[in-house]
Amino acid sequence: MAESNSWRSHRESDGNRSIPNGDDARNVRETGVQTDAKVQGQGPRLSKANLFTLLSLWMELFPKREACQQENDAAGVSGLVVVHECRVLGLHCSSAQLHAGQVAVVKHGPRLKSCELYFSRKPCSTCLKMLINAGVSRISYWPGDAELSLLSESLHHGSSSALQEAVLDATAAERLKSNSRPHISVLLQPLDCTVLQFLDETSQNADFLGKIVADNPALDTGDIYRREFWNNSDNFLEKFFISDEERHKYVLNKMGLENFCMEPNFSNLRQHMRNLIRILASVASSVPALLEDYGFFMREPVGMGSPGLPQGVIRHCVIQARLLACRTEDPKVGVGAVIWAEGKQSQCDGTGQLYLVGCGYNAYPVGSQYAEYPQMDHKQEERQNRKYRYILHAEQNALTFRSAEIKAEDNTMMFVTKCPCDECVPLIGCAGIKQIYTTDLDSNKVKHDISYLRFNKLNGVQKFIVSVREK
């Protein structure tokens, strides 16, 4: 695990080196999902490209009730994020029947036109030709192994014919790329030097860990977080990182990424991949997996309403919301929210019957420039110069920019990283949300200009709160 141990002594400045990819990331003026803002002046936050890339990696790990092995080939599971005009239309992963790209075509069809797609693996030629034909504007992918694995030991039974097919498919995919209109590339943007440390700190201080420690003062948040972090780090590096440099160069060459094999591009690429994996490990560690019998359990009697989701799926969705919070425009109180619904019929997606309704994070109104609105909290004595009346909450943005309508017949669920405030509770109740998964650490509290008194009084919505499993 030499690669894993290398972060302990890594220089954060390495993650800031620009990665050549046709666009100079340092000279691109980033347009936020909400606020138009240059990198200068903003607090530490993930870029859109890095956020969507991390979401695609995380979707590859979506828990499945049964093993997902494609029936018709040796393709590995891929995660996919579908984005249109900075709005997330879908979070997908491969199923037993379909690759992630095929899932997108079936689920979105003509709505894929002008969309940006972020894959956790370079898609195969079968998916690429369909997506190009659908008129997508950009296809970005993680620079690890391809969907049809180019690493022989990753293939089932180590079949040489399967490896040969993977090489032929990589050649066909490269030809499709060179002759297509969409921009197909690796899109990893430089990290601000403070992002890694900031996200480590905010993950360690997340409400989910805070709830566990509040109930058990003898526990140490730092110890819990570090144990989870190093476990996640090892697992994610094994999953998403090719530790052997020569084998990594072989894969990059087969995928048409020869420029990345030359120094300093190669070292910069690998350092940036490690940094993003570290962020994913950090965020995932903020929601421990059933630590000390903790999980998301319903307050009401079990007989009321729909049954809750499996704990693994709940945790996965909450971590999606935590990743969204990394893009917040209020880094002091970053909040993320994601809405999923459970349909009645089996779907082609690797998420089973679940489909994305919407997602968001707290941010200022669309189109506003940085510092147009107050940034200060209660420390600003003049109340009219505080941020609270201007910033949109994560729950509000998830409902406003939803990609699907909320259906009365489906079980619609919201996953949010903090207890909903009194401004959001009525919206959640009236929108048709049937279940909410969150923490009640702030419930029944008043914090200066924001209160949390109405959450416990929210009727008609099942509340699944971080708590100890009943014996």
From Swiss-Prot:
Active site positions, chain numbering: E395
Region listing for Disordered, in residue ranges: 1-27
GO biological process, one term: cytidine deamination
Entries under InterPro entries matching the protein: APOBEC/CMP_deaminase_Zn-bd, CMP_dCMP_dom, Cytidine_deaminase-like, dCMP_deaminase-rel
Record GO cellular component, one term: cytoplasm
Enzymatic class: hydrolase
Presence of keyword Zinc: yes
Keyword terms, alphabetized: Hydrolase, Metal-binding, Repeat, Zinc
Listed cofactors: Zn(2+)
Short name of any one Pfam family annotated for the protein: dCMP_cyt_deam_1
Binding site for Zn(2+) 1: H99, C124, C127
SUPFAM superfamilies (alphabetical): Cytidine deaminase-like
Residues in CMP/dCMP-type deaminase domain copies: 57-153, 312-460
EC number: 3.5.4.5
Segments forming a coiled coil: none
Catalysed conversion reaction: 2'-deoxycytidine + H2O + H(+) = 2'-deoxyuridine + NH4(+); cytidine + H2O + H(+) = uridine + NH4(+)
GO molecular function, one term: dCMP deaminase activity
Cross-referenced PROSITE patterns: CYT_DCMP_DEAMINASES_1, CYT_DCMP_DEAMINASES_2
Record-listed Zn(2+) 2 binding positions: H393, C421, C424
Signal sequence annotation: none
Protein family according to the UniProt entry: Belongs to the cytidine and deoxycytidylate deaminase family.
PANTHER family listed in its UniProt record: DEOXYCYTIDYLATE DEAMINASE, DEOXYCYTIDYLATE DEAMINASE-RELATED
Role, per record: Catalyzes the deamination of cytidine and deoxycytidine into uridine and deoxyuridine, respectively.
Protein name (Swiss-Prot/TrEMBL): Cytidine and dCMP deaminase domain-containing protein 1
Lineage: Eukaryota, Metazoa, Chordata, Craniata, Vertebrata
